[in-house]
């Protein structure tokens, strides 16, 4: 059974994320590298546990969190779809079909306007991803360009952020 630890040390996945970080830095886009993917993976795992998903679902959420942005090195516009397909190409024969589908669906749905959450893992990933707001994610140095980009403005303005999950609500 594949674990989050296995995914985090897979050379293909790590290289895709490194290439994403280089690509996003080259265009002065918000950091989507290993710092971000590790935070999202950890938060997704934690959120899943807090809302009552079982341990394996938490692990799947963490895997989706670690891999969710790795398609950015191919294209920013469709990175979520490419990320899902890349995950399948690397790990397709190592998962039960349903687990693979849940991870792919979460990755594919994390950055689309018409998000369809048919499983809590997808919603968990979006919460984990969007909650990583921090000045360190801003790669742009020109303050006028930072002011012009909504992602950079929000991240630049944030020195610390915390996410609290209220299971009752």
For the regions a language model picked out, list residue spans one by one.
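Ubiquitous "structural anchor" signal
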Residues: 73, 79, 91, 137-140
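Structured all-alpha helical bundle cores of eukaryotic regulatory proteins
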Residues: 82-89, 93, 121
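His-Asp-centered metal-binding catalytic motifs of divalent-metal-dependent phosphohydrolases/nucleases
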Residues: 40, 56-87, 102-112
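Active-site-adjacent bridging/hinge elements
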Residues: 13-19
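General secondary-structure edge motif
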Residues: 20, 24-27, 63, 87
């Amino acid at each position: 059974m594949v674990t989050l630890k296995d995914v985090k040390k897979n050379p293909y996945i790590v290289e895709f994320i490194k290439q994403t970080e280089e690509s996003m830095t080259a265009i002065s886009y918000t950091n989507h590298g290993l710092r971000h993917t590790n935070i999202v993976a950890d938060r997704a795992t934690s959120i899943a546990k807090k809302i009552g998903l079982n341990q394996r679902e938490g692990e799947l959420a963490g895997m989706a969190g670690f891999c969710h942005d790795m398609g950015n090195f191919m294209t920013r516009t469709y990175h979520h779809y490419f990320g899902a397909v890349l995950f399948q190409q690397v790990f397709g024969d190592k998962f039960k079909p349903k687990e693979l589908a849940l991870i792919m669906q979460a990755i594919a749905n994390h950055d689309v306007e018409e998000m369809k959450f048919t499983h809590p893992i997808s919603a968990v990933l979006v919460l984990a991803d969007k909650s990583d707001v921090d000045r360190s994610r801003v790669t742009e140095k020109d303050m006028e360009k930072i002011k012009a980009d909504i992602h950079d403005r929000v991240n630049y303005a944030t020195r610390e952020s915390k996410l609290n999950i209220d299971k009752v609500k």
